[in-house]
Amino acid sequence: NNIKFYELTKALGCQFDIWQKGSDTDHHFPASQKLWELCDKAGDIYKKSYEGLYCVGCETFYEPEELNDSGECYEHPGKKLEVVKEENYFFRLSKYQSQIIHLITSGKLAITPESRKNEVLSFLKQPLMDISISRSNERAKNWGVPVPGDNTQRMYVWFDALNIYQSGVGFGWDDTRYNKWWPADVHVIGKG
């Protein structure tokens, strides 16, 4: 798909300064490792042993209430989940719940359309759980951004993937470029 999007930009007459994927070790890896280090320094990352139901197809842990009546992932019905116990790093998402709600309700963080804003606020009425942000090298098959200071772990893809917006403009590898382009005036996130 990456090649198709690259070709589409050319067909539309668009040009770009950098074409980047999450596997980019020159730009994205250092940016993601810097993000990790900043979060760690702020006390937002901790390591703990975790046991849960794991869907290999989604590469995600699920709570029982997130599964269908047969105890299967909705995306992969018919495939049994694995009970996995491993030590991972977690991000203290719970620490930021009230700040996120305030940013949205005050209008400082705009979400459109209104129905999506209401969807997010409805979700935020429940306590946010801290989220696992790493996988063992074995589970990750040594793919992904290495966790700084721990050669047994890789960043979970959804921790580093969103950082690609910043890494593309220099975060973690070119401060002059980054300070010129960030923060962006508008962020567009597509949902398929």
Spans of model-derived segments:
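N-terminal Rossmann-like or analogous alpha/beta NTP/dinucleotide-binding catalytic cores
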Residues: 1-45
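Short hydrophobic/aromatic-rich motifs at helix boundaries and adjacent loops
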Residues: 5-9, 70-73, 92-93, 173-176
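Residue-level marker of positions within ordered structural domains that often coincide
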Residues: 10, 44, 60, 105, ...
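Short secondary-structure capping/junction motifs at helix and strand boundaries
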Residues: 10-20, 41-52, 65-67, 83-84, ...
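Glycine-centered flexibility sites
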Residues: 13, 43, 59, 144, ...
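Structured secondary-structure scaffolds
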Residues: 20-22, 30-34, 77, 82-192
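Cys/His-rich short segments
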Residues: 42-97, 101
